[in-house]
Amino acid sequence: MRFQGSSNYVSTDDLTLAVNAAITLQRPLLVKGEPGTGKTMLAVEVAKSLGVPLLEWHIKSTTKAQQGLYEYDAVSRLRDSQLGDERVHDIHNYIVKGMLWQAFSAERPVVLLIDEIDKADIEFPNDLLRELDRMEFYVYETRELVKARHRPIVFITSNNEKELPDAFLRRCFFHYIRFPDKETMEKIVGVHFPALKKSLLREAMEVFFEVREVPGLKKKPSTSELLDWLKLLLAEDIPAEALRSKDRKTIIPPLHGALLKNEQDVHLFERLVFMTRAKGA
């Protein structure tokens, strides 16, 4: 089973190599990179390309590792016991299978996405070490050992909000998705907007990378935000020439709210771009 790329996702050679290396080693692929660089979509497209189901576990700050295995609803069982419900005699009625259990019990290999693992507390990755390494876990309430019928292809994404434990890192294959250069970005845009006029693409790309290169910017726009912006430009039929105005009143690009998400960044960009374009006039 090998990933050969996807017509809906621009995968660089090194990224494709990393995916296949993780599959060969049967280790989770830990993917880091700026927000909006396609870390989550990578798992989606790999699943589509390989023709296997996708299971997604989106991590929050309150998520516990146990939830990925299973949860035992003791409160509901106690309530049913008090009401004389017949369901109470079978403990399986009160066990909710987590994403790892679903992946382990699947009748065919699946892609399992553990998304934004760094949002959880620092012990979260360590609490999954044994389960991801041995592909099994024990259910104490039913005294059964759950083993993976087929080893899932595991993708783990991180935005680098927290450092991950060394013991966890040793069990992963790592890849950092670098922010796309202009050539790669044009390919990405081409996948989403194949009929986009070259003039609009050229001007939009110039503005986008100009925004990203502004020193002191609090939040640089991401790939996904560029795609949102282009979608709006097309919907509003904004011409290419409107993106490069030298007029102080219109120097900020139309619909800039898709790119700049902070008022200080808007003012900073406006000031620097006006000075740059005024010099070039």
Regions found by a protein language model. Give the residues of each.
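C-terminal regulatory/interaction module of P-loop NTP-utilizing enzymes
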Residues: M1-A281
